Amino acid sequence: MIIVISPAKSQNFEPIKTAYQFTQPIFKQQIIKLINTLKHYEVEEIEKLMKISPKLAEEVFAKHNSFNPNKYDNSNAKAAIFTFSGDVYKGLEADTLDNKTIEYAQNHLLMLSGLYGLVRPLDLIQAYRLEMGTNIKIDGKILHKYWQDKITTQLNEYFSQQQNKILINLASNEYSQAIDKKSLAVKWLDIDFKENKAGAYKTIGIHAKKARGLMTRYILENRIENVSDIKKFNVAGYQFNPDFSDENLLCFTR
């Protein structure tokens, strides 16, 4: 069983003291191609491309131009699971997971990324900003199409070493479209979270993101390897709701 989640635009590069064996990014050649493309963009072009403020565009420009795709170590990079710090990662709270759970996560959790493609928890990453939905073409393909074959092939390789061949999709649509479901040789299971608002159940972005992190943590901490145990998730008031679920989707409501 492998979980996939989205990355986060917010990143924390404060040093941490750990004794983990860090790993290098999977798709180094593709990263070089992408970062070299991004380095050609001036501040004004970044502002327009990424639909961000001039100040933020300057920060992104600086990040990309200081990016060294041939060097990943503690001087310029940090393990991905401790770096991403958006809503999903607030639910995950990776810095409070024990060592054995982090090591388990290394083989059961993957983060999708516009720049890195697939990221394992202990892969070292440098500061960047490139959402999967960014309107940029690489080798004549939009970003998620550029990554699709590479990511799907790598996932199939990882699953060849897994006993339970189920992909738990806790990523957003923007990122999960970078996986070719038709070419994935395993079962795909979506998970959704809904809130009861005045008698109607709705998916609310900020709550759903944090819940994805909570679910990721639940699966990792409990070493869950089957769907029936995922249904037992009852964190933060969420419970499995069969009325909104089917064989390809588990929905949790509160």
From Swiss-Prot:
A single GO cellular-component term on record: cytosol
GO BP annotations, alphabetical order: response to hydroperoxide
Domain of life: Bacteria
Pfam families reported in the protein's UniProt record: H2O2_YaaD
Family: Belongs to the UPF0246 family.
Protein name: UPF0246 protein FTL_1717
Organism: Francisella tularensis subsp. holarctica (strain LVS)
